Swiss-Prot record:
Source taxon at top rank: Bacteria
Keyword field contains Protein biosynthesis: no
Note: The N-terminal, regulatory metal binding site 1 has higher affinity for cadmium than for zinc. The second metal binding site has higher affinity for zinc and has no regulatory function.
Coiled coil: none
Name of encoding gene: cadC
All copies of domain HTH arsR-type, residue ranges: 24-119
Protein name, entry field: Cadmium resistance transcriptional regulatory protein CadC
DNA-binding region listed in the record: 59-78
UniProt-listed InterPro entries: ArsR-like_HTH, ArsR_HTH, HTH_ArsR_DNA-bd_dom, Metal_resp_trans_reg, WH-like_DNA-bd_sf, WH_DNA-bd_sf
Chain sites annotated for binding Cd(2+): C7, C11, C58, C60
Residues reported to bind Zn(2+): D101, H103, H114, E117
Gene3D superfamilies: Winged helix-like DNA-binding domain superfamily/Winged helix DNA-binding domain
Effect of C7S: Abolishes dissociation from DNA
Amino acid sequence: MKKKDTCEIFCYDEEKVNRIQGDLQTVDISGVSQILKAIADENRAKITYALCQDEELCVCDIANILGVTIANASHHLRTLYKQGVVNFRKEGKLALYSLGDEHIRQIMMIALAHKKEVKVNV
């Protein structure tokens, strides 16, 4: 027999609900959501992972790692840059990218560890 994944009656803990609703007003969930959305694209997740493996990569390196055009890699990198996931700098004719900070590396590594532990339905 399959278990229902919903409550069979409607009730809630008013104290918990009020406390958590108040907490939600004090944090930038929308900003967090935007960061996670940026990384959620498979190519951008690959870029993030690649930058976890090497401190700095140029656009050409990333394009070759992903097997995409430089224009496509640049598009994904711009999205990641706008969300603060990656940093960018120019060195001569090279456009070099690195992770925005250690938190991004941690997010990626934790997500990979979590994926190994649970079965994710796609």
